[in-house]
Amino acid sequence: MALKFMEKNIKDTEDIPIVVVTSADIVSYIKGYHIYKSVWTPTVQEHVYGEIEPDNPVDKYAVAVKKDKKVVGHLPLGENGKFAKTIFYFLRADPYGKCDITVTGKAVNLGDGDGMQVPCILHISGQKSMMEILKQQKMTKEFKFL
């Protein structure tokens, strides 16, 4: 599992603590395209973002994928049900946590019962300590850190 990291240091002043922000890329899919296709047509290299959706009536650990503040899909649960939940907890716990998403292909049906899904790369960033915890999670075999 190859990891790609970038770090930025925010310089310390008397009143501002030093925060080390690290990022990693994860290959994934945006699920629910068949539901949201009337409001979103994904294009390769398009940028969208992930945002927690704790009031989702179907999944209280849902991570919505949004474009212009509108839901256009969700992150998948993953084969062991922990993928979206792990990202949800990370985004909720880390005040510097972000999930930027880049579309990498056209919608496909993977034959897993989740309908049409859009291939993407999640650009996850946050505090170095929180990213270390995220890296240690065994979310699923099909979602790999780059």
PLM features: residue spans?
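Conserved active-site motif detector
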Residues: 1-146
